[in-house]
């Protein structure tokens, strides 16, 4: 009979990062030089497979589980939170196509005073311009009218915004025109031959 052994994984908390428990039992706030992010342990481990313990005095996180693959998963997710509040995450998009371009409307230039989010105006060959409102916690920079940089503290939110912008005009399989990730390779098809 196979015996199960408990595997422990220890993550050291970096110096400039502070962790504070909130009023809710399973939610912790991670604060760093770039801002703060929260982690919900109940949402992270829905099935109760692992025991995740934040030891704030010793500046470490202890993950204890019977399954090593879950230890690696939870370790990577927590390290991504630490990396996000200390360095941040960037995703680069490029727009390919004649006349395709993006413009950024800053929230200070818009008429509404309640709105604090920037808006990206995309000209992608449609009969109308596409306005994409950037959510809170994410910043968008235009390096040129055809290059978009998406920056934020939460990796999940940054990649979700990048995917939403890319889906407004995904790359064409025949000519490759559209919005793509900077290092993405588009496999194009050949057209019909007569």
UniProtKB/Swiss-Prot annotation:
One of its GO terms (biological process) is cytoplasmic translation. Disulfide bonds: none annotated. The keyword Ribonucleoprotein applies. It comes from Prototheca wickerhamii. It holds the Pfam family Ribosomal_L6. It is found in: Mitochondrion. GO terms for cellular component: mitochondrion; ribonucleoprotein complex; ribosome. This is Large ribosomal subunit protein uL6m. GO terms for molecular function: rRNA binding; structural constituent of ribosome. Belongs to the universal ribosomal protein uL6 family. It comes from the Eukaryota. Keywords: Mitochondrion, Ribonucleoprotein, Ribosomal protein. PANTHER family: 60S/50S RIBOSOMAL PROTEIN L6/L9 (PTHR11655), LARGE RIBOSOMAL SUBUNIT PROTEIN UL6M (PTHR11655:SF14). The keyword Zinc does not apply. PROSITE patterns: RIBOSOMAL_L6_1 (PS00525).
